[in-house]
């Protein structure tokens, strides 16, 4: 079974549509987001607040982590850091302990104004030079750095989770029925 966090959102639900034996971790809310999943066959739908308990004694083939507060105008720093950094860190810890491949979706918001360019250089030094312009970009940037620092400190980590790890950076501008400016990605080793 695969777990897709953020699987009820626009991009996540389209990914889920292409997968089999998948569980979704997301807040459905009251704005009709459930409709994105209504035509899908799902193994489960789990609220993020219940994920830790759900993961107990569970074996997953992989985790695709897309869940985040993605509004670039978000202002609640505590909520954004809890959701985008701390929750992500706990999920990465679980994947590490259970040798589960972890695919993480970052954001092009980590580039900031682009004074360092928009080319994916997965080195820690290159990431440390990036200056995100908003809280959302900064929260994703912190997690990008955490992953790369763990990989640098513990080379066996990549083998333990069945690598290669993949870092995807999506641009935040979306339109109904499609992305108008795509994504960039780089394998992280």
Question: Which role fits each region the language model picked out?
Answer:
Residues 1-62:
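N-terminal Rossmann/SDR dinucleotide-binding element
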Residues 5, 25, 63-67, 102-108, ...:
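SDR active-site strand-loop-helix element
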Residues 14, 18, 94, 146:
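Rossmann-fold NAD(P)-dependent oxidoreductase module
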Residues 30, 110-111, 166-169:
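Conserved sequence/active-site signature of Rossmann-fold short-chain dehydrogenase/reductase
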Residues 39, 48-83, 112:
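NAD(P)H-binding glycine-rich loop region in Rossmannoid oxidoreductase-like domains
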Residues 82, 86, 90, 97, ...:
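Catalytic helix-loop patch of NAD(P)-dependent Rossmann-fold dehydrogenases
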Residues 141, 154-155, 166-182, 189:
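Glycine/proline-rich active-site loop of Rossmann-fold NAD(P)-dependent oxidoreductases
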């Amino acid at each position: 079974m695969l777990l897709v966090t953020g699987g009820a959102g626009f991009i996540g639900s389209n990914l889920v549509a292409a997968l089999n034996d998948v569980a979704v971790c997301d807040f459905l809310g009251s704005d009709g987001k459930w409709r994105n999943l209504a035509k899908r066959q799902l193994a489960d739908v789990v609220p993020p607040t219940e994920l830790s308990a759900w993961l107990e004694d569970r074996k997953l083939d992989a985790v695709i982590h897309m869940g985040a507060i993605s509004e670039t105008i978000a202002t609640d720093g505590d909520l954004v850091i809890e959701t985008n950094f701390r929750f992500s860190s706990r999920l990465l810890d679980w994947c590490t302990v259970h040798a589960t491949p972890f695919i993480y979706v970052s954001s092009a918001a980590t580039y900031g104004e682009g004074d360092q360019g928009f080319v994916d250089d997965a080195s820690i030094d290159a990431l440390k030079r990036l200056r995100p312009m908003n809280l959302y970009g900064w929260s994703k940037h912190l997690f990008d750095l955490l992953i790369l620092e763990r990989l640098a400190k513990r080379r066996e980590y990549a083998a333990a989770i069945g690598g290669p790890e993949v870092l995807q950076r999506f641009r935040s501008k979306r339109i109904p029925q499609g992305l108008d400016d795509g994504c960039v990605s780089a394998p992280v080793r």
